[in-house]
Structure formats: structure tokens, C-alpha cells
Amino acid sequence: MIIKAAVEIYGKVINEFLPTPAKCHYTLNLRDLSKVVQGMLMCDTKVIENKEYLIKLYICETYRVFRDRLIDDKDRQKFSEDSHDVIEAYLSLDWELPDFQNVAFGDFDNSEGHYMKLGTVDDLRPKLNDLLAFYNLQNTAMDLVFFEDCVQHLARIARILRQ
């Protein structure tokens, strides 16, 4: 059912978010759909605990592949609503819309390097500060504050680099 949901959201994206001169990068093809599956395959099966965990992984990957390309709030909100509808229809799960935006996966929150669901910003902050301290020992020191948006962007960057 997850593949059917991914195909459904892909269909909605290519039909609703058409390229315009201001949004010429809204050009998608089947390779983008395969990136959703590729992102899901980065997660080790030992880490996937249940159906809800798998759906969160699916949500994260569709958001990274499709939603992160959208440049205005109206388009991002429409994508979130479409995703919510697809999740309800295909995967029989009813979540509140704000819960969708806070799902993030990465490989820097555990010692094994598994791609898995990240904790909250408060959970990640000590780990990120340790990684920053290690970096600062070897390079020119950086002084970073790990607020919520920063952690979300770090997760996105780490995902890109992992691929």
C-alpha cells in the first residue's frame, strides 16, 4: 500500500504543481518517485518497529523529495493536505496535519550509523554539540546554536550526503 500511496502523491504533485516561469524547477519525473523508495531503503529493516514507523519513514521521504522543492507556503500547505489525504485513504492512519511536518530521519543520532527516526530537538542537541566539539578540535572553531530549523536542515543535508 505504501507504493500505491507514493504513486498517488506523485500523481497529485505532477498535476497540481506545474512549472511556471517563477517555478521552473517544479519539473518532476519518475526518477523522483524512485528517490522516495531509495530513501526508504536507506533504513535498515531491524530499525523498523511497526506500521506507524514505516509510515513515518514514507512521510519523511515524500516530504524530502517533493515538498522541499516547493517555494511558497501555499504550495507547501497544499502538499501537506494532499499527503494527509493519501495517508488516510491508502494507509488507514489519521494523524493531525502538524504531526507530518515534524518527522525527520537521519543517521547522526546513533552510534551504529543507522538511518532512523530522529528524536526531538532537545534529545538531539547534546549529540550535535558533541559532534560540533569534535569538529572544532580538528578545524577552525564554529559556534553554532542548534534550534529546531537548524536541526531539520542538518537532517536534510545529512540525508543528501548519505545518498
What are the residue ranges of the model-derived segments?
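Alpha-helical lid/collar subdomain of P-loop NTPases
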Residues: 1-162
